[in-house]
């Protein structure tokens, strides 16, 4: 389970949340390195940061040192919407190559600080760019990859984008964990992610209902029956 930790109160709530769930909790950190430290101290099983928006190298190191103390993984997240200006200028625009360069630079920064308990994530709302970035990153990265199409959209549009993007990536054997990002109830994200994995033969369980699109031979309420 992933929870955003924008305040100290949110960080302190992690301990209570952990008492009520049976799965690991990931703290999503934006900008304030102190929230990462507080989240770790309050029981986060993993933290997600973008070192590029945490601040100075000293602040990143403070987070890395705390993660090392508690031996929890850091997910290094790179997003097409916040790619560094110098990399965008180098490639002329946001590109898959630029996303990979940014991710590997951040990984090296943390490795140089003496830590390698890492997970890497590259996300974009551009399906084909995201797929290409993962194809480029996978052979260069020894760490687990968290895969997702960010800002995919509302339930209908977001499910289609996520299914296509994740399908391309996962079908190449790339990816260790996934997230479907939808604007709506996050419970729908879980159902969609499970169905994508089942469709690709990567998850078992449940029943697959096979139903035709209806035709002139249909003489029952097939749509209602299938939905039921």
Predicted features along the sequence, with ranges:
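N-terminal active-site wall of soluble small-molecule enzyme domains
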Residues: 2-42
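Glycine-enriched alpha-helix->loop->beta-strand junction motifs that scaffold or abut catalytic
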Residues: 20-23, 41-47, 68-70, 138-144, ...
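Hydrophobic or amphipathic alpha-helical targeting/insertion segments
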Residues: 23, 34-75
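Catalytic alpha/beta core domains of metabolic enzymes, predominantly
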Residues: 79, 87-228
């Amino acid at each position: 389970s992933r929870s955003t930790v924008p305040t100290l109160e949110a960080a302190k709530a992690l301990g209570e949340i952990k008492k009520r769930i049976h799965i690991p909790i990931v703290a999503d950190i934006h900008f304030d390195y102190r929230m990462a430290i507080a989240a770790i101290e309050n029981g986060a099983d993993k933290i997600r940061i973008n070192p590029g928006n945490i601040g100075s190298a000293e602040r990143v190191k403070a987070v890395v040192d705390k993660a090392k103390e508690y031996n929890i993984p850091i997910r290094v997240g790179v997003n097409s919407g916040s790619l560094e200006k110098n990399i965008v200028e180098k490639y002329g625009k946001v590109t898959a190559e630029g996303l990979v360069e940014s991710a590997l630079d951040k990984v090296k920064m943390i490795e140089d600080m003496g830590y390698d308990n890492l997970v890497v994530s590259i996300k974009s709302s551009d399906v084909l760019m995201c797929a290409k970035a993962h194809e480029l990153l996978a052979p260069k990265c020894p760490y687990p990859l968290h895969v997702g199409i960010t800002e995919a959209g509302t339930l209908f549009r977001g499910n289609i984008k996520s299914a296509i993007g994740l399908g391309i990536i996962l079908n190449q054997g790339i990816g260790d964990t996934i997230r479907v990002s939808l604007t709506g109830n996050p419970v729908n994200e879980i159902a969609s992610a499970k169905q994508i994995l089942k469709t690709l033969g990567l998850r078992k369980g449940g029943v697959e209902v096979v139903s035709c699109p209806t035709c002139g031979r249909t003489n029952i309420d097939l749509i209602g029956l299938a939905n039921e």
